[in-house]
Amino acid sequence: ERLQAALPERYTLVQELDRGGMSRVYLARESLPERDVAIKVLDEELSARLGRERFVREVELTSRLQHPHIVPIYAAGDAGGTLFYVMPYIAGQSLRDRLDTEGLLPIEESLQITRQVAGALEHAHDKGIVHRDIKPSNILFQSGHAVVADFGIARALRAAESGGEFTQ
């Protein structure tokens, strides 16, 4: 595939995991270090509107967020004009998946998830970063803990979609 040819050699695409209006997420295998990763690839039109410099700036800001309940960004790049970033592959379900299959969650578990997500948001806010797209599909479960995905990148994507500039 064209995307595979454009990605750095250390990544081998395994399968598409999710597709949205502005991006696709792939399971990939990284060769060094050897591990499974998720690669989020932005739509080409959105990549062009966003611009490499703005994207890199947002990824650099987001990559500074080191918190147990925030999905880290390992790397980012430009694959033939298509912007992408690499994060850990999290095999667990999203909160959206759990709510769809289980309905209401027990109150104690709901409170635990809320505390973990609030801790992640507080950490980011302390660093001047706002998620702006917090929703059940961006809350994933890893080893029984809630982790927030797409941190900071949502701000860049919304700005590019609307033609606006970044704000704090």
Enumerate the language-model features and the residues they cover.
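Conserved ATP-binding/catalytic core of the eukaryotic-like protein kinase fold
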Residues: 1-168
